[in-house]
Amino acid sequence: MDRRNFFKFSAVSALGATAVEAKALPDKQIASIIDIDLCDGCAKETMPLCVKACKIKNEPIFPVPKEPMMDYWPQTKHEDYSKQKDNISRLTPYNFTYIEKLEVDGKMLHIPRRCMHCDHPPCQKICPFGVISKSEEGAVDIDKNFCFGGAKCRDACPWGVPQRQAGVGIYLKVMPKLAGGGVMFKCDMCKDLLEQDKKPSCEVACPKNAIKFGKRDEIFAIANEMKKTRFIYGMDENGGTSTIYVSSVDFNKIDGAISKKYENKPKMGIMDMKKHPNPMEKSEFLAAATLVAPLAAIGAASIAVIKSVKDKK
């Protein structure tokens, strides 16, 4: 891409940055059901098998930070999980799924948590560099090669899913002291496996069949039948998602238990179960998205140039 096309691309993108969004194809869309009543957290295992399978699958993309790590200018801090790689109690750049253990009304619950893969992901809309995409199957993914780690995606996500690791990423080569802060990491629904018509690692590893992926219309039909006798979560939250939870316990009670468990404790990487509306419908987020649009256009154009140069080498 030459200089003229760069500016042309920027101008066109600026006009449509808030409206353009990658769409999953209806005939290829995948969704999942997580049956909380079936999950026992792999009580006899040293690590829940879905968590273990996820870590093994994604180990090749785990960050290897460069020392010393820069603080997030103008702040005097940075996020570093490189000494906590074995922490499976929450989402981190080295752990894309975890099991939330709760006791509600005398019943023990084990809830697999990871990215919900929203129908209209606010993280994608708010990203100032346009590096978050949605696959034909509906998987929401972050391009780790071009993410600056600004964490706007985490701010926009109702569940705070994406997690940041400092000391890695393109910002080290572009503006190590003035922009970014690393790379954001999260579950990508094993989109490479989905593209091959294979099942995600977490489903394959689950010994209780508590995790089930399938064609979206089929999964939603199952969920609609289940909600006649049980509670569901994820079908309407944040404007709709591709992850549906089913439980015999009311999700309002589950969310209350989560809030109580983490009261006065660090909540980074911990997902709640509130009935979230889509934050992009709120005026403050719409305003933020409008302000970010020109940046997204320039960022997307810049990344297109970098990719073009890289492809020519």
Q: What are the language-model segments listed below?
A:
Residues 1-313:
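Non-ligating segments of multi-cofactor redox enzymes
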